[in-house]
Amino acid sequence: IIGPVLGMVGSALGGLLKKIG
């Protein structure tokens, strides 16, 4: 359960960082 959730969160955070950076 934790694995997939962390993956989704990581993808979301990565997208935000790319937009900001």
From Swiss-Prot:
It is found in: Secreted. The modification D-allo-isoleucine is found at I2. Keywords: Amidation, Amphibian defense peptide, Antibiotic, Antimicrobial, Cytolysis, D-amino acid, Hemolysis, Secreted. One of its GO terms (cellular component) is extracellular region. Expressed by the skin glands. It comes from the Eukaryota. GO terms for biological process: defense response to bacterium; killing of cells of another organism. The modification Isoleucine amide is found at I20. Has antimicrobial and hemolytic activities. Belongs to the bombinin family. This is Bombinin-H1/H3.
